[in-house]
């Protein structure tokens, strides 16, 4: 793979967003890169971010920000298994 994987930039900026989940106002902090990916996942599912967060919130055992990051990682891992990376000769 060429180029820096962790190039400094806006993707690392920590953003706080507020949502109303289960009748309560909730603030969630994640890096911009995670928010961008989460937004794309919700859109691909035809759902709002709030609805997807509510589902994850109902099933989580850890902090909500952590649960969202793990959810994003697991979705990306599942997608990578069904669509191998370019140049993967295995």
Label the predicted regions.
Residues 73-90:
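Short, solvent-exposed charged binding patches
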Residues 1-20:
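A detector of short terminal or domain-flanking linear segments
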Residues 11, 37, 89-90:
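Short linear motifs in intrinsically disordered/low-complexity regions
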Residues 16-73, 78:
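Amphipathic, hydrophobic secondary-structure cores in small proteins
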């Amino acid at each position: 793979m060429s180029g820096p994987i962790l190039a400094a930039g806006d993707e690392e900026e920590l953003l706080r967003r507020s949502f109303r989940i289960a009748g309560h106002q909730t603030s969630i902090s994640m890096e911009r890169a995670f928010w961008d990916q989460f937004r794309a996942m919700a859109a691909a599912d035809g759902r709002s971010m709030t609805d997807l967060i509510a589902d994850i919130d109902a099933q989580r055992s850890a902090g909500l920000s952590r649960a969202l990051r793990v959810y994003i990682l697991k979705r990306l891992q599942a997608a990578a298994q069904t669509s191998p990376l370019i140049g993967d000769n295995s």
